[in-house]
């Protein structure tokens, strides 16, 4: 890689587990880069945007000491100060890491049945047919569905004709360009269970 190559690691779903057991955890990339002799190659970002208030949460960055010093030198002239009242609101509400986890269990109780409904419908309608594969996530907000090659855009269009609006085909790829035109990101968290059941069928 080029000497100035950097990894910007968006760890948005680090505490978004659907289950109390059977949780997935990502490798601690900053630690691994440090072990490999490249501590300055990575910046890790996270926020409470999908925990408390969308677009109005508390953000955080983790990086090497050198990168944080560099980062602070820019930040101190880009802003006169962070929203300390919002920070205080978050601290008073969540209190600590246990408070965050307790809150996220409430999220999981709401969205887990929606995920299970979609996954059960996919298995019932498409299981064993060899025309699609899908993830069975333990957390986050999406199910990744892979259709047969060249079909994703057509599936999304047909679903829209039937009154079901899906995320655009290939949305998970850079610039939305899926070379196989097979990936659809399913987001079951927003609809009501009743609407979701109809849409999934």
Region roles according to the model:
Residues 1-8, 12-54:
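Active-site pre-lysine segment of PLP-dependent enzymes
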Residues 8-11, 46, 60-62, 135-136, ...:
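Short beta-strand segments
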Residues 31-112:
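Conserved core segment of the aminotransferase class I/II
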Residues 38, 161, 176-201:
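PLP-dependent enzyme catalytic core of the Aspartate aminotransferase-like
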Residues 46-49, 131-132, 170-175:
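Short, solvent-exposed loop/turn elements at beta->coil junctions and helix N-caps
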Residues 79, 161-167, 201:
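A common structural junction motif
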Residues 105-119, 131-146:
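Conserved glycine-rich beta-strand-loop-beta hairpin in the small C-terminal domain of fold type I
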Residues 148-152, 191-193:
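Helix N-cap motif at beta-to-alpha junctions
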């Amino acid at each position: 890689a080029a000497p100035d190559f950097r990894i910007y690691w968006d760890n948005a779903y680090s505490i978004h587990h659907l289950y109390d057991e059977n949780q997935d955890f990502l490798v601690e990339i900053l630690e691994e880069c440090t072990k490999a002799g490249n501590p300055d190659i990575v910046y890790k970002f996270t926020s409470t945007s999908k925990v408390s208030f969308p677009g109005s949460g508390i953000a955080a960055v983790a990086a090497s000491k050198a990168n944080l010093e560099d980062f602070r030198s820019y930040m101190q002239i880009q802003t006169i100060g962070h929203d300390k009242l919002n920070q205080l609101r978050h601290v008073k509400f969540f209190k600590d890491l246990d408070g965050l986890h307790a809150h996220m269990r409430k999220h999981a109780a709401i969205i887990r049945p929606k995920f299970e409904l979609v996954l059960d419908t996919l298995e019932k309608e498409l299981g064993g047919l060899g025309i699609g594969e899908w993830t069975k996530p333990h957390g986050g907000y999406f199910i990744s569905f892979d259709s047969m090659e060249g079909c994703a855009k057509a599936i999304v269009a047909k679903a829209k004709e039937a009154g079901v609006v899906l995320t655009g085909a290939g949305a998970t790829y850079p610039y939305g360009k899926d070379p196989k035109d097979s990936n659809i990101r399913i987001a079951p968290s927003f609809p009501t269970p009743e609407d979701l059941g109809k849409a999934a069928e």
